[in-house]
């Protein structure tokens, strides 16, 4: 499917001008006639390039403050004209063929992201002529090349040189795919923005208008193909959002190790999002999307040592996340002690990377330091639909807790309660977390009965010889019966933090009082399914 088409005339009109001068120079040097508009034309002319303004080409001036520039039959006829089929009509109307269109669109996303952006500002950054040219060229890809990404400039010049001034149909088709993806994403952004403006137009509160749009348009870019999915018989790929504003596994840089698997990415996300909850040096070890050890310490080495002690068996082959730079001492401790799939941290020292390089299969990721958590949406696919909700960024402080028992917690119990409450948010429901001295000592995850999660947490602590007496316990949701409190008391727990809200709260509180346990209500649940 060679079907080469020579590139003799190109129309260039870009908002993002990165690389456009060099690209235009390369085209001009190869005998390509340049047409252009507005700021792009002025820039090319300033650089000494022979460029024809579209208004001169069409004989019709730009008008309405630039709203109408390229919407003209001589432009779109030149793009849409089918070579060998529409030649006569093109000659009759003095329409010259345009073989390449180089366009990227007004920066709508960047405009509406600016603080104080008005609806009028947004509207003026809705591109009309650009998408029209892009779609016209993509539709007629059998004859015309459409270029919407500056990252394609170099490859296009190389192919023109290799093919005596022409581009192949395969290349034009691939460029057309990118073009349609580009305009689809652009229209989605505009639709989503206008959907968010419904309250302003209808005089309603956001609650009355609805938090979520009537039609949900999502745009993700493929970052990589995976060897397989969650299981070896499933195919998979990793897609990421554009313009992510928060350090994440999606934006992280892999500095060492073999390619990440589907499960690696899911587990690394769980570990990183958990470790972000802590201001102090912290370590989170995750296995199968559940934390199996979490601790804060005087250093990340101290935090790692303590997190590992929670459950060394489960830590084998786990994912380790830190909220400080990975240093050589900590890297050496990990490599000497256990098999690890992934280590992720804001950064890694050169000395640390030399140590981890000795284990070629260890994947090391750096994600940069994070600031405030960014609100967003979470999605869960169901057969035939998609569940959408706000990200669970909720967290309570000591001042928001309610003591509902006769006994008040000690200062250490309170610190441990707040610590394990943060961890419980990232454990699959039903979630129970035991903690003492700012480290987890037992985690019960994913049980259908809350009391069994409590029992498992106690069993794990006992198996590792960790002292439960005087510890705090967090439950991600309320206790429906007193049995969970009885199990915790039998293990040695002396403080419980939970949301409250059960019809049997009085019974549960009475059980805590019987055992001399301090109980704190958060009035906030953290189910995780």
UniProtKB/Swiss-Prot annotation:
KW Transferase (keyword) present: yes
Record Pfam families: AICARFT_IMPCHas, MGS
Spell out the reaction equation it catalyses: (6R)-10-formyltetrahydrofolate + 5-amino-1-(5-phospho-beta-D-ribosyl)imidazole-4-carboxamide = 5-formamido-1-(5-phospho-D-ribosyl)imidazole-4-carboxamide + (6S)-5,6,7,8-tetrahydrofolate; IMP + H2O = 5-formamido-1-(5-phospho-D-ribosyl)imidazole-4-carboxamide
**Sites of the modification N6-acetyllysine?**
287
Q: Which UniProt keywords apply?
A: Acetylation, Hydrolase, Multifunctional enzyme, Purine biosynthesis, Transferase
The EC designation for this entry is 2.1.2.3, 3.5.4.10
Its cellular-component GO annotations read: cytosol
Q: Which residues form the MGS-like domain?
A: 1-148
* GO biological process per UniProt: 'de novo' IMP biosynthetic process
Pathway given in the UniProt record = Purine metabolism; IMP biosynthesis via de novo pathway; 5-formamido-1-(5-phospho-D-ribosyl)imidazole-4-carboxamide from 5-amino-1-(5-phospho-D-ribosyl)imidazole-4-carboxamide (10-formyl THF route): step 1/1; Purine metabolism; IMP biosynthesis via de novo pathway; IMP from 5-formamido-1-(5-phospho-D-ribosyl)imidazole-4-carboxamide: step 1/1
GO MF term list: IMP cyclohydrolase activity; phosphoribosylaminoimidazolecarboxamide formyltransferase activity
Taxonomically, the superkingdom here is Bacteria
The family note in this entry says:
Belongs to the PurH family.
Regarding domains, what does the record say?
A: The IMP cyclohydrolase activity resides in the N-terminal region.
Q: Which NCBIfam families is this protein grouped with?
A: PRK00881.1, purH
* Designated name of the protein: Bifunctional purine biosynthesis protein PurH
Q: Which organism is it from?
A: Escherichia coli (strain SMS-3-5 / SECEC)
Lineage start: Bacteria, Pseudomonadati, Pseudomonadota, Gammaproteobacteria, Enterobacterales
